[in-house]
Amino acid sequence: MVQRLKTVYEQEVIKQLMTRFQYKNIHEVPKLKKITVNRGLGEAAQNAKILEASVKEITEITGQKAIVTRAKKAIAGFKLRQDMPIGVMVTLRGDYMYAFLDRLINLSLPRIRDFRGITAKSFDGRGNYNLGLKEQLIFPEVDYDGIEQIRGMDISIVTTAKTDQEGLALLKSLGMPFAES
C-alpha cells in the first residue's frame, strides 16, 4: 500500500522544492531518510515491567517492534552497570516512516493541549529535526486505561537536507505544523 504522505512528496513537494531552491537535479531535493523514536527509562534497571510496557507501547505507536537499548558502560553515580537495560528505541524507514509521520502530523500533534504549532528552532544545523513529547496519550493507538505512568519520548526526523532552511521547507511542505515565530 502506497502511503499518502509519500505520494504527496513525490507529486507536489519535489516540484515545490526544485523551484524554490533552484535544484538542477531531482536527486538534490531533500527527502526523509529515517525517523527514530526513543524513550529513556532510568528506572527500567530496577523494574522489568516498566521496560516491557514501554516496548509494547512504542511498538503499538510506531507499528514496528521496538528494541531495548542497554548501557554501554557502568556509571556508579546512577547505580548503572554495563549492559543494563536503560531505554527503548525504534528506527523507522520506508513506508513505516511515512505512515508514522502522517499519523503524527494529522492525528497526534493536534491532540496536544494548548497546541499552537511546534517550534522551528529544534533543527540541528544539518537539516534534521528533533522533537520531544511529554506524554504518550496523544497517540490514538495508546489505551488510556492500559498505562501506569505518563512518559514522554524523543522523535528524531533525519533528512538529506544540507541546511536547516531546506529541512524546514521539506517538513513544512509535508504538513508539519510549525508555530509562527
Curated annotation (Swiss-Prot):
Task: For this UniProt record, give its keywords in alphabetical order, as a comma-separated list.
Answer: Cyanelle, Plastid, Ribonucleoprotein, Ribosomal protein, RNA-binding, rRNA-binding
Entry keyword annotation includes Thylakoid: no
Report the GO terms under cellular component.
cyanelle; ribonucleoprotein complex; ribosome
Return the Gene3D superfamilies for the record: 3.30.1440.10
One GO MF annotation is: rRNA binding
Which compartments is it annotated to reside in? Plastid, Cyanelle
Which SUPFAM superfamilies does the protein's record reference?
A: RL5-like
Q: Name one GO biological process term.
A: translation
Q: Which Pfam families match?
A: Ribosomal_L5, Ribosomal_L5_C
Q: What role does this protein play?
A: Binds 5S rRNA, forms part of the central protuberance of the 50S subunit.
Q: How does it assemble?
A: Part of the 50S ribosomal subunit; contacts the 5S rRNA.
Family per similarity comment: Belongs to the universal ribosomal protein uL5 family.
Kindly provide the name given to this protein in its UniProt entry: Large ribosomal subunit protein uL5c
